[in-house]
């Protein structure tokens, strides 16, 4: 069995630690604790790291296509490594959830998220597992684009660190249990 866990974000240091890059931040937290290094897979437009957990190959992916084209990298890697859509998890930001909240979902629409729209368009289904991380709504007078491409407020630093650790724990629980539904029950909150 092979699994692929994808964190969404935008490439380049200009986007480091922005709200829209919380998926990249989550992947970075997970792989750091597993001592995995990324290599750039130019053919797939992604940074990819891998390891074995319980005799399963696990790929950790950060597409470098920019958010709105994430589906290009996801589809290419699923096809190349012959990974089932049932073995895909995507981690990304959600405007409609308060900062630091986590929600696990087994399927659903893109909900206005362009990275998820791209993935759905390229793989041809909404039926894949996801972990949404709340980044909150823009403050009065701020545009959505400035909000998602902005950094978290200093007041949110501890919340975000705790959230990333919770996502790390949840992903590791999932990889041990091999059951997304049980992970949802334990970590949705």
Swiss-Prot record:
Cellular localization per UniProt: Cytoplasm
Site positions (Discriminates between blocked and unblocked aminoacyl-tRNA): 10
Main location (coarse class): cytoplasm
TM stretches of this protein: none
Domain of life: Bacteria
An example molecular function term from Gene Ontology annotations: tRNA binding
Chain residues that bind tRNA: 15, 66, 68, 114
Keywords carried by this UniProt record: Cytoplasm, Hydrolase, RNA-binding, tRNA-binding
Keyword Lipid metabolism: no
GO biological process entries: protein quality control for misfolded or incompletely synthesized proteins; rescue of stalled ribosome
One cellular component (GO) term of this entry: cytoplasm
Active site, UniProt feature: 20 (proton acceptor)
EC number annotated for this UniProt entry: 3.1.1.29
PANTHER family found in the cross-reference section: PEPTIDYL-TRNA HYDROLASE
The protein's assembly and partners: Monomer.
Family from the record: Belongs to the PTH family.
NCBIfam families: pth
Protein name: Peptidyl-tRNA hydrolase
Protein species of origin: Streptococcus uberis (strain ATCC BAA-854 / 0140J)
Gene behind this protein: pth
